């Protein structure tokens, strides 16, 4: 897969009371689903899944195998995001690199999975106080595939009145 880089510059502040935007990274529309897995394992196409209501390949659907099916046909966090580079105002820590872990909370950021029909699994990065206190000046997202990056108000993932796509 080809890596894609997205850079977002923000007005820096080290005020922890100011809410910081959440970055939601989604596979682009054409990359949202694993076409080979749908075709070779489940014998359906992306169009069958998206547009013809062939949601699941079995009649015995339950919440556990529905989630397993969705995870099998969409991309995990590490498949989508290679790393984030965050530049700060700090003289001692001018740049921080974050290599995400599945659903893991790391020192400077937490990643949450967002489930969508349009983009498959998306991943929202919420900066922690440790990095916010350094004053973020730039966020560079290096993706493993074509992605959309949404800037959301915290807690309002993909709401049409509270997001921007970069």
Q: Whereabouts are the PLM-identified features?
A:
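Non-transmembrane functional regions of membrane and envelope proteins
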Residues: 1-166
């Amino acid at each position: 897969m080809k890596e894609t880089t997205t850079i977002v510059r923000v007005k820096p502040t080290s005020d922890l009371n100011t809410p910081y935007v959440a970055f939601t990274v989604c596979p682009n529309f054409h990359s949202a689903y694993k076409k080979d897995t749908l075709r070779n394992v489940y014998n359906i196409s992306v169009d069958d899944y998206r547009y013809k209501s062939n949601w699941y390949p079995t009649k015995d659907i339950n919440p556990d195998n529905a989630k397993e099916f969705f995870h099998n046909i969409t991309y995990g966090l590490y498949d989508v995001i290679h790393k984030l580079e965050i530049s700060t105002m700090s003289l001692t820590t001018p740049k921080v690199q974050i290599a995400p872990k599945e659903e893991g909370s790391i020192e400077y950021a937490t990643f949450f999975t967002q489930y969508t029909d349009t983009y498959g699994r998306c991943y929202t990065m919420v900066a922690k106080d440790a990095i916010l206190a350094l004053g973020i000046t730039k966020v560079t997202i290096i993706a493993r595939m074509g992605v959309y990056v949404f800037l959301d108000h915290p807690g309002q993932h993909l709401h049409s009145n509270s997001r921007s796509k970069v």
